[in-house]
């Protein structure tokens, strides 16, 4: 039984890694249609080249234009309450997606649960739209 489980896991990983071959080279983006109640809108950008993910960027942009990963005040508040800042949390999520190739396999970052869940949701939307050849996915909250 354990061998079957390992085989299924290996097969899923291999199939997941190969599934990007149908996605044309380029950068794809997923974001929300509206800003949240605090004026932030998160986005995910993934660049594919040769059937592989080569770059992942995840962040939030405020309606005034600033980015959460670079907002010192937000960093101070988030770090004080959760022990991690947005720049580190977002980098961990992006690196995990590059490594695993599947947003569903990206673990929740401790202290950034809401962002982790949103990251997965944006990741699913981005991959679905990219497979249809669409460069941008805009989803509702």
Swiss-Prot record:
Q: Which Gene3D superfamilies would you find in this protein's record?
A: 3.90.1010.20
Q: Tell me the compartments it is located in.
A: Cell membrane
Which PROSITE patterns did the record assign?
PROKAR_LIPOPROTEIN
Lipid modification (S-diacylglycerol cysteine), residues:
18
Topology relative to the lipid bilayer, per the entry, is: Lipid-anchor
Gene Ontology CC: one annotated term: plasma membrane
Q: Which domain of life is it from?
A: Bacteria
Quote the residue positions with lipidation, kind N-palmitoyl cysteine. Answer: 18
Provide an example Pfam family for this protein. Answer: FMN_bind
Q: Which UniProt keywords apply?
A: Cell membrane, Lipoprotein, Membrane, Palmitate, Signal
Q: Where is the signal peptide?
A: 1-17
Its main subcellular localisation, reduced to a broad class, is membrane
Q: Which GO terms describe its molecular function?
A: FMN binding
Protein name as catalogued: 15 kDa lipoprotein
Q: Identify the species of origin.
A: Treponema pallidum (strain Nichols)
């Amino acid at each position: 039984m354990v061998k079957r489980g390992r085989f299924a896991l290996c097969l899923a990983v291999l199939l997941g890694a190969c599934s990007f071959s149908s996605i044309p080279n380029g950068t794809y983006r997923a974001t929300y249609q509206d800003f949240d109640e605090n004026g932030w809108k998160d986005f995910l950008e993934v660049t594919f080249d040769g059937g592989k993910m080569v770059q992942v960027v995840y962040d939030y942009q405020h309606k005034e234009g600033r980015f959460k990963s670079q907002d010192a005040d937000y960093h101070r508040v988030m770090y004080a309450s959760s022990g991690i800042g947005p720049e580190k949390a977002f980098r961990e999520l992006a690196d995990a997606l590059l490594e695993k190739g599947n947003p569903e396999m990206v673990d929740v970052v401790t202290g950034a649960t809401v962002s982790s869940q949103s990251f997965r949701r944006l990741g699913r939307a981005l991959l679905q739209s990219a497979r249809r050849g669409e460069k941008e996915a805009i989803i509702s909250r």
